[in-house]
Structures are given as C-alpha cells and as structure tokens.
C-alpha cells in the first residue's frame, strides 16, 4: 500500500459544511498542515471530494 502526503493549501473558510468535515476527518486543521495516510479506497474518495483544497504527493518508503 502506498503512503500519501496530504497538505491543505487553500482555506476551508466559506466552503460547504460537508467539505469542511471531510478536511477535518483527514486530520487537517489549518492551512499548510501536512499529514500522511495509507492509500485506501475510502481515502481516495475523500481526496476526490476536496481535491481543489489539497496538494497530494506519494511518499517513497
């Protein structure tokens, strides 16, 4: 399974409530926060929903 590094690059202020909840469920609280997660189908769905707010990179293990 691949690891993904996810960074919040745009503000969640003024976004749809379900998009804000999705970003928070990823563990991102404020701009330029970075988290790493294993790539799963559930994660890919979340990333697709809020892709316009994020920068996603694959991490080499």
UniProtKB/Swiss-Prot annotation:
Annotated protein name in UniProt: Large ribosomal subunit protein uL30
Keyword annotations: Ribonucleoprotein, Ribosomal protein
Underlying gene: rpmD
GO BP, sorted A to Z: translation
Domain of life: Bacteria
PANTHER family registered for this protein in UniProt: LARGE RIBOSOMAL SUBUNIT PROTEIN UL30M, MITOCHONDRIAL RIBOSOMAL PROTEIN L30
Regions crossing the membrane: none
Pfam family, one: Ribosomal_L30
Organism: Fusobacterium nucleatum subsp. nucleatum (strain ATCC 25586 / DSM 15643 / BCRC 10681 / CIP 101130 / JCM 8532 / KCTC 2640 / LMG 13131 / VPI 4355)
């Amino acid at each position: 399974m691949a690891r993904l590094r996810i960074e919040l690059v745009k503000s969640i202020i003024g976004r749809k409530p379900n998009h804000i909840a999705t970003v928070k469920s990823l563990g991102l609280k404020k701009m330029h926060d970075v988290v790493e997660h294993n790539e799963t189908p559930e994660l890919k769905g979340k990333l697709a929903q809020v892709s316009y707010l994020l920068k996603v990179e694959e991490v080499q293990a």
